């Protein structure tokens, strides 16, 4: 049986480069590579797409939309941009068994955003269980390493001379972050969350927190009841761990270099903080993309992942 042929369009970007490095170490796929001088050659890119069984689009949104239009329906595509996240099959298999089966058969998959992965991992189980009020205010803070901003932000931080770049920075304060639409749609929310991302002076790792109180729920709940919702939701998830004992302090870079995600539940009788910790380049990008590729190709979903 021949190995599946994989082509990465956008192999020099942050996510594309990570995928290239990871797939180069595997012997169960055939990685198709363009010479550096051909990376912007449209004809050469199309020829690679024609040869491939599965194509990763690791491009800016507009370029991803254009490239997707070149690809025939018989080819499998994983788009890592935001362009198709509210339109194509959403690549978060742990959310629902039916979604996992859809991922296995789809030809068009949108890889989740990094911040969105954390937010959705926390909101979706509560919404699915019918516990959240339709008009609940959902404040979310999400702390990321600077690699989440791509090559330019990486260069800015690693060559920084300004002292202020040594401290955390809130951004997207206009409340229009590009991950909000997918969070809202995938979780079935009628009101968009109040989402504040924060970038800090470390390379990779992400910690996303959701703040809730009793007014967020349709009925009174306890911390243990909330914990049980997550335990049930992720009981068969190989890449999601729900902690029964949550520490009072969480570091955001603990999962750097890993492809799994952790859920923590903290709080008291009235207020709760749910946290998701993972690597923005792992379960938040490359790791999720490889997991989805494995599922779409009929392979073990954990193949080549770092847990």
Predicted regions and their residues:
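C-terminal active-site/capping subdomain that shapes the small-molecule cofactor and substrate pocket
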Residues: 211-307
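Short catalytic/ligand-gating loop segments at beta-alpha or beta-beta junctions
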Residues: 194-201, 242-248
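Acidic-histidine catalytic/liganding microenvironments
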Residues: 26, 129, 190, 236-237
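N-terminal Rossmann-like NAD(P) cofactor-binding subdomain of oxidoreductases
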Residues: 1-166, 171, 266-268
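Conserved glycine-rich beta-strand-loop-beta hairpin in the small C-terminal domain of fold type I
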Residues: 204-208
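Anionic-ligand binding region
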Residues: 154-159, 166-199
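Anionic group-transfer/hydrolysis microenvironments
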Residues: 81, 199, 279
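Conserved active-site and cofactor/substrate-binding residues in soluble primary-metabolism enzymes
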Residues: 10, 14, 114-121, 174-181, ...
């Amino acid at each position: 049986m021949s190995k599946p042929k994989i082509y990465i369009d956008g192999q020099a970007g942050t996510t594309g480069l990570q995928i290239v490095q990871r797939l180069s170490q595997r012997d169960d796929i055939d990685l198709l590579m363009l010479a550096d001088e051909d990376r912007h050659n449209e004809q050469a890119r199309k020829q690679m797409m024609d040869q491939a069984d599965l194509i990763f689009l690791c491009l800016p949104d507009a370029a991803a939309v254009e490239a997707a239009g070149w690809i025939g329906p018989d080819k499998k595509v994983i788009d890592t941009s935001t362009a198709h996240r509210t339109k194509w099959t959403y690549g978060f298999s742990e959310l629902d068994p039916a979604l996992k089966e859809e991922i296995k058969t789809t030809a068009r998959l949108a890889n989740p955003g990094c911040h969105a992965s954390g937010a959705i991992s926390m909101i979706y189980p509560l919404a699915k269980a019918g516990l959240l009020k339709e008009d609940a205010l959902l404040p979310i803070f999400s702390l990321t390493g600077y690699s989440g901003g791509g090559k330019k932000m990486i260069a800015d931080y690693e060559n920084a001379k300004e002292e202020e770049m040594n401290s955390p920075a809130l951004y997207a304060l206009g409340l229009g972050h590009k991950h909000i639409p997918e969070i809202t749609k995938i979780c079935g929310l009628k009101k968009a969350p109040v989402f504040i991302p924060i970038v800090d002076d470390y390379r990779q790792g992400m910690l996303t927190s959701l703040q809730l109180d009793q007014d967020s729920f349709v009925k009174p709940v306890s911390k243990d009841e909330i914990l049980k919702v997550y335990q049930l939701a992720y009981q068969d998830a190989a890449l999601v761990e729900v902690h029964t004992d949550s520490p009072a302090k969480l570091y955001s870079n603990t999962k750097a270099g890993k492809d799994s995600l952790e859920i923590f539940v903290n709080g008291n009788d009235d207020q709760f903080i749910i946290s998701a910790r993972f690597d923005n380049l792992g379960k938040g990008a490359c790791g999720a993309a490889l997991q989805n590729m494995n599922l779409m190709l009929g392979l073990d979903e954990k193949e080549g992942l770092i847990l």
